[in-house]
């Protein structure tokens, strides 16, 4: 069975989350340096069956795109060119970073660990994936 992959795209780092094969549980996978993201996806797609990729869509409260959308659009063009057969969807990612930090607090992580932006990105990708699964 194939998995679903979610990306919390950032200009420096991208958080990656994946479902189990039954598509019931979302788990953080890793955080990738964004310039290495396409190579990471190539390798991952060779080793794992992936049914679709979800990419976070950052929006402002008035539903207009955030400033980072310009960079995401550049990535999406490259993604579609490199992986034309892979279905891709956008998922509203408003507040995922705040939710990620709150989940770290609720989980009892020390302040030093909560400052780990790579971990925040990975948890944010997991929240994006969970949001999609529960819709």
Curated annotation (Swiss-Prot):
Subcellular location: Cytoplasm
Gene Ontology MF annotations: nuclease activity
Keywords: Cytoplasm, Hydrolase, Nuclease, Ribosome biogenesis
Stored InterPro entries: RNaseH-like_sf, YqgF, YqgF/RNaseH-like_dom, YqgF/RNaseH-like_dom_sf
One GO cellular component term noted in the UniProt record for this chain: cytosol
Domain of life of the source: Bacteria
EC numbers for this chain: 3.1.-.-
Record-linked Pfam families: RuvX
Disulphide linkage map: none
Annotated GO biological process: rRNA 5'-end processing
The keyword Repressor is assigned to this record: no
PANTHER family registered for this protein in UniProt: POLYNUCLEOTIDYL TRANSFERASE, RIBONUCLEASE H-LIKE SUPERFAMILY PROTEIN
Protein role: Could be a nuclease involved in processing of the 5'-end of pre-16S rRNA.
Family under the similarity heading: Belongs to the YqgF nuclease family.
Name the UniProt record assigns to this protein: Putative pre-16S rRNA nuclease
Taxonomic classification: Bacteria, Pseudomonadati, Bacteroidota, Flavobacteriia, Flavobacteriales
